[in-house]
């Protein structure tokens, strides 16, 4: 099955071919949501046989299961109860895996600015956690979301449904809005790897940066920078298929052992072993996301320069 995606220039923006009975789709949100929502995705599998899928560490994701069997999630080595129909997957610094039994999972990526506009809660409380979505959002909104997505005739109809429901949600005004948006851009900037440099760019102290990072990004600023640096490097290895290509890793890594220590933190294993675990959804999503949304993984998503 070949899921068509809007092509963008770049080595990762390649045609996405899925095995028979599986499909993947990415969509950009309404431009008014662009700073809050990093993108929409839908993964579908017809078979009801158990399937294990692995995904890279990422910012907050809202997930809604449609016509799905039991979904058993794990973050790193921690297992969670079966996911309810609508869940919030908090910001992660460990790999996320799920054992599914067919159906569709609709994902809504939430940026740090989106988190600040959606809720007054601290994102660090959800670090490496999965909770029912109605414990964070108004249950009536969650019910409406589930009902509308269930009624959508096909995957192409998901975007307008999501836009309509999500637009009214991001209304909270946060006093740190400008710092959050600046931090979103700086974290994913190639070459940015030091907390001191990041704080200086923002014009704030390292302690203030740490508090902002924990509250809105869900983890300390040092860990946030390490995650972005590691994923920039790992994605290059993943796409090339060569897990030992030292020329692909970020130059701020002292050597390959330094990179492998980060791999153990963010993948729980070596790049080679994780790549052997890669399933069709992860392999396709790296290219499909780059083609449609401009970045191969949510944690490297650059925010829009201007807000309409």
Question: Which role fits each region the language model picked out?
Answer:
Residues 210, 214, 218-229, 260, ...:
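Basic, alpha-helical helix-turn-helix
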């Amino acid at each position: 099955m070949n899921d068509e995606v809007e092509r963008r220039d770049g080595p990762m923006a390649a045609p996405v071919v899925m095995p028979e009975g599986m499909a993947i789709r990415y969509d950009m949100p309404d431009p008014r949501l662009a700073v809050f929502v990093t993108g929409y995705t839908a993964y579908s599998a017809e078979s009801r046989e158990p399937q294990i899928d692995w995904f890279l560490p990422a910012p907050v994701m809202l997930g809604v299961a449609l016509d799905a069997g039991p979904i058993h999630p794990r973050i790193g080595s921690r297992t969670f109860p079966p996911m309810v129909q609508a869940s919030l997957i908090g910001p992660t610094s460990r790999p996320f895996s799920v054992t599914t039994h067919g159906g569709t999972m609709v994902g809504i990526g939430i940026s740090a600015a989106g988190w600040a506009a959606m809720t007054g809660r601290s994102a660090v409380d959800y670090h490496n956690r999965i909770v029912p979505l109605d414990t964070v959002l108004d249950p009536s909104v969650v019910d409406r979301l589930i009902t509308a997505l269930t009624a959508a005739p096909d995957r192409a109809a998901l975007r307008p449904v999501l836009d309509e429901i999500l637009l009214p949600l991001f209304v909270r005004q946060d006093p740190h809005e400008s710092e959050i948006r600046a931090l979103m851009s700086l974290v994913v900037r190639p070459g940015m790897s030091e907390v001191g440099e990041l704080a200086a760019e923002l014009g704030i102290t390292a302690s203030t940066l740490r508090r902002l990072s924990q509250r809105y990004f869900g983890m300390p600023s040092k860990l946030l920078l390490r995650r972005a640096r590691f994923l920039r490097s790992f994605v290059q290895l993943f796409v090339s298929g060569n897990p030992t290509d030292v020329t692909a890793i970020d130059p701020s890594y002292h050597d390959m052992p330094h990179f492998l220590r980060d791999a153990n933190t963010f993948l729980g294993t070596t790049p080679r072993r994780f790549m052997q675990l890669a399933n069709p959804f992860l392999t396709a999503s790296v290219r499909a996301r780059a083609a449609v949304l401009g970045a191969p993984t949510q944690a490297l998503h650059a925010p829009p320069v201007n807000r309409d």
